[in-house]
Amino acid sequence: MLTTVLGPEGYAAMLAGNPAGAVWAVDHGDYAPDSVEYTCVAGVVLRRDLPLDQWRGIYGDVDGLLAAGVLEASPTDATRAHITVDIRPVAARGTESAEVLIVSDQDSSMTARTPAPNHVPGVGNAPLSLLSVLPPVSDAQRAGSPPLRVLDLGTGSGVLATVLATSHSAVEVTATDISSRALGFARCAFPQHASIDWVEGSWFEPVEGQLFDLIVSNPPFVIGPDCGLSYRETPLDFDGASRLVVEQAAQHLANHGTAHLLAAWALTEADSAASKVTGWIPGEDIRAWVVQRDLVDITTYVHTWLTDEGIDTRSSEGIKRTADWLDYFMGAGITHIGMGYVHMKRTTGTSSEVTFEVMDQALQPGTFLGHETREWFARAEWLDRQDAHSVLDTQYAARPTLALEHVSVSDGDLGVGFKDYALRLSRTDGPAWSHEVDQHVAAIVKGINPDGLTLRDTAELYAAVNGLDGDAFTDALAPIVVDLVRHGLILPADIVEEL
């Protein structure tokens, strides 16, 4: 409904925290001011004062809402009112499930306000970001299996728990939070849903000894000098909250279970982000994919989160808060903050394997990476079973969305024309991975066929035709192909049907 009523520009304005632009879009849209659609968007989402008759059009009798403070009468006109809570629709990505409504406190995106210490956030960028990387689970995949046991740690207003519970028929969700107020909001979204157990408690204490098939968490990972806002900050120093969640989530995974977590890591000049996060992951029985989406300097980080809190960093309060926060970082030598996802899968009888990758390339707006997350583990498990010989003795398929890019730049030496600069294999879908290759690798990828020759036969034939040493060529090719498979540019024929 939001995109329909607001249109693309109005919807973008809403997401950017530009209420004036969003209001203009709805006022100049196709829906009359007395329509239900207009009331839902202008009144509920954009928080405009509207006549009580319009509120009755969507809520019926509004006396109870006024008495409870959900609606508040305008101070200048008792026949008009505005909403005091946030109600947003959200749906699972990668499925055709219906939207659910999430109820929470209002943030500062549409109206000027500073969140209270017990503020309960709603459908914001963090849960939407995590939903965009969660692998979809279809009922067909679960047919004949026990219900999927899901833990939403630190559920807040229940975005992740409610979406997961309503997306599939065979799930049992445990949703925990330290805040009883947050759980009260969460129950509003789907109070009668039998498959959600709302539990109050700190971190993993409410689920001690329990194992889950799926763990999701958008924990309070903001790194700051105090814990004034419980929804985003904790008493744990620096990245202690992220570390705790990663370490303990691994302990609560059932065999083959997966965890998908938002996390942040504080870095000094001497720190390696890969080494730091790898140190949080147990040494046995875990395969992990850590994806760093952002790396920001501490000045940018502090400004971002003070603005999120509704603090004007130009004000005297904002200037003091900024200085205190930066002093906190500099006292520990912290210069940058990394943020991203930690994906883990429980294995058995193996040493843990951690892959850390930087995914800072621009992606298409709305890109859904849930399928990529699931496929990454399938590709990693396939690679784990191979050696250099079996990699060469396999047939491969080029990904349907694979592009071969020829990059030329102006020829400064001649002063005219262009000269070859780079040759790249790039995915035009999902994470948009791109690998620079030479003409030999490009030629081999052009020649692979899932029903044709093995990679070894293709490479040896190419080497013979082009006067290359066959053994040296295939030996050099194997690790390159491993990297191409890891990023899904080419796929082993024997797992294509599984993906």
Question: What do these predicted regions represent?
Answer:
Residues 180, 217-244:
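Mobile active-site "lid"/loop adjacent to the S-adenosyl-L-methionine
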Residues 34-86, 131, 135, 140-146, ...:
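Long, charge-rich, low-complexity alpha-helical segments
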Residues 1-40, 110, 349-446, 491-499:
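Acidic, low-complexity/disordered tracts enriched in E/D and polar residues
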Residues 298-377:
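Flexible, glycine-/basic-rich loop-and-beta segments that form/coincide
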Residues 238-292:
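Conserved Class I SAM-dependent methyltransferase catalytic core
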Residues 100, 338-342, 421:
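Short beta-strand micro-motifs in enzyme catalytic cores
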Residues 74-150, 157-159, 163-166:
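SAM-dependent Rossmann-like transferase core, predominantly class I methyltransferases
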Residues 124-217, 223:
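Conserved SAM/SAH cofactor-binding pocket of Class I
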